[in-house]
Swiss-Prot record:
Pathway: Protein modification; protein lipoylation via endogenous pathway; protein N(6)-(lipoyl)lysine from octanoyl-[acyl-carrier-protein]: step 2/2. Residues 79-296 form the Radical SAM core domain. Its cofactor is [4Fe-4S] cluster. This is Lipoyl synthase. It is found in: Cytoplasm. GO terms for molecular function: 4 iron, 4 sulfur cluster binding; lipoate synthase activity; metal ion binding.
Length: 320
């Protein structure tokens, strides 16, 4: 017998080191991959000065962006426009979803100064709309809800008039506690992603539960009826269009009014492969269906991600 795998605290496990310890799915890194269609080609900006400026600002304050940690395809566009999605509570996630490029492992203790550093960075960047997300922190008693609340509090104290969107984990087993903690410092938009369809959850989101996520969205809306709730879905992981439409309807049935829907892209050969590339006309169909279902805002397109042009979506602009 081999020696059992033991993780070291604070070490980032990525790619094969991460996905090899997922019991549900064996991923063959040598499998033949789908060719990326023309509409999925990204044109990089000629000038990277703004991009490097934001990266350096993050490093200087000891902060992380989900844009970098999750290898988002929109990083160059967003950073070039001076926007970023901040990722709090470290860069090591206690979950190991095989679609995600964020590192897995045993996280370090929370940085108690992070909320203040985050608020100061946002002030320096002169942001009017900010998205705050996090890794999953199943090691924390409140799953990180208190840290979210403290970040919102500090950001508002230094940045009057700012709009804050939080993209939260599922607070596994602590939904009621998390919502209670957020009562003192609620966000302007509450976002939690379903990611994909329930049939594929065991394979795509090990450790998560479709009904838990719907419950979180519903219960937050019940406590804060005037705060928009939002959720995101990836396509191209083996789901059908009919299943996606059912997830969209489930979201509406649970009070969600804002939707993001984009194409899944494989971060590396050690992650889940792309099962299909969805044509832009299909995304247009999903947006039309979302409007028919009663979503107030639906951003649907190949490169759409949860926080992609979040400020524009929150103000009612078209994002695709």
């Amino acid at each position: 017998m081999g020696t059992p795998f033991k993780m070291e605290r604070g070490v980032k496990y990525r790619d094969a080191a991460k996905t090899s310890i997922i019991p549900v799915k064996n991923i063959d890194p040598n499998q033949e991959l789908l060719k990326k269609p023309e509409w999925m080609k990204i044109k990089l900006p000629a000038n990277s000065a703004k991009i490097e400026s934001i990266k350096n600002g993050m490093r200087r304050h000891g902060l992380h962006s989900v844009c970098e940690e999750a290898s988002c395809p929109n990083l160059h566009e967003c950073f070039n426009h001076g926007t970023a999605t901040f990722m709090i509570m470290g860069a090591i996630c206690t979950r190991r979803c095989p679609f995600c490029d964020v590192a897995h492992g045993k996280p370090l203790p929370l940085d108690k100064d992070e909320p203040k550093k985050l608020a100061e960075t946002i002030q320096d960047m002169k942001l009017k709309y900010v998205v705050i997300t996090s890794v999953d922190r199943d090691d924390l008693p409140d799953r990180g809800a208190g840290h979210f609340a403290e970040c919102v509090k500090e950001i508002r104290a230094l940045n009057p008039g700012i709009k804050i969107e939080i993209l939260v984990p599922d607070f596994r087993g602590r939904v009621e506690q998390a919502i209670e903690i957020l009562k003192e410092n609620p966000p302007d938009v509450f976002n939690h992603n379903l990611e994909n369809v329930p049939r594929l959850y065991k394979e795509i989101r090990p450790g998560a539960d479709y009904e838990w996520s719907l419950k979180l969205l519903k219960e937050f809306k019940a406590v804060f009826p005037d705060i928009p709730t939002k959720s995101g879905i990836m396509v191209g992981l083996g789901e059908t269009n009919e299943e996606i439409l059912q997830v969209m309807q489930d979201l509406r049935d649970h009070g969600v009014t804002m939707l993001t829907l984009g194409q899944y892209l494989q971060p590396s050969r050690h992650h889940l492969p792309v099962a299909r590339y969805v044509h832009p006309t299909e995304f247009d169909m999903f947006r039309e269906k979302a409007n028919e279902m009663g979503f107030e805002h639906a951003a649907c397109g190949p490169f759409v991600r949860s926080s992609y042009h979040a400020d524009l979506q929150a103000s009612g602009g078209l994002v695709k």
